[in-house]
């Protein structure tokens, strides 16, 4: 089964002495690695800038999701920003799929999931002002997925720390909307949540 087709996955941050490049493992419910999320295109100078200041968050960033055999499935590219963020999403071959666009700069975080023609496919939003949990809603506002740090019944509780979370996406979600949902949910800590800091 492709990583993109899974209805449940667990995202676990790889331990680093100094976090200069984000990299997360994607695991199944048995704790087997099924993919990885990796920040790409960072020069040594960019890594140093990230370590010594917060200016790095305003520069262009690229993240990619790979499956277990190293095949690139999704790429997220965030052009340089000041306030609201916009992520351009493409498939592993570089073909545009759509975008993830931040709606607000105050209050609970909310991102629109848009198709390639700009059509509204769904929403990715925080459940409240202080919760880390997020909901995925379809175009009609119906919940079809969730990102949470609260889960039960897994065989990998030993891995649970503040930087781990569970992604659940309904099997009915398909096409570009599913790719955008997986991209936003799987990358919430590496891209969207960290990017929502600073002036946002």
Per-segment meaning from a language model:
Residues 1-62, 66-73, 78-86, 92-97, ...:
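Low-complexity or membrane-interfacial segments used for flexible interactions
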């Amino acid at each position: 089964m492709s990583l993109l087709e899974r209805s449940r996955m667990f995202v676990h941050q790889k331990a680093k002495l100094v976090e200069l490049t984000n990299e997360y493992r994607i695991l199944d419910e048995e704790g087997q690695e099924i993919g990885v999320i990796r920040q790409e295109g960072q020069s040594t100078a960019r890594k140093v800038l990230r370590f010594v200041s917060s200016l790095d968050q305003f520069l262009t960033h690229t993240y990619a999701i790979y499956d277990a055999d190293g095949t690139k499935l999704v790429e997220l590219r965030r052009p340089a920003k000041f306030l609201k963020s916009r992520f351009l999403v493409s498939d592993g071959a570089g073909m545009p799929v759509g975008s993830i666009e931040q709606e607000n700069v105050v209050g609970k975080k909310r991102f629109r999931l848009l198709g390639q023609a700009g059509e509204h496919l769904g929403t990715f939003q925080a459940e409240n002002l202080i919760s880390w949990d997020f909901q995925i809603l379809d175009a009609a506002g119906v919940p079809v997925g969730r990102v949470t740090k609260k889960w039960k019944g897994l065989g990998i509780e030993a891995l649970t720390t503040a930087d781990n979370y569970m992604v659940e996406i309904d099997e009915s979600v398909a096409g570009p909307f599913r790719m955008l949902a997986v991209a936003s949910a799987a990358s919430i800590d590496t891209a969207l949540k960290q990017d929502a800091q600073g002036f946002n």
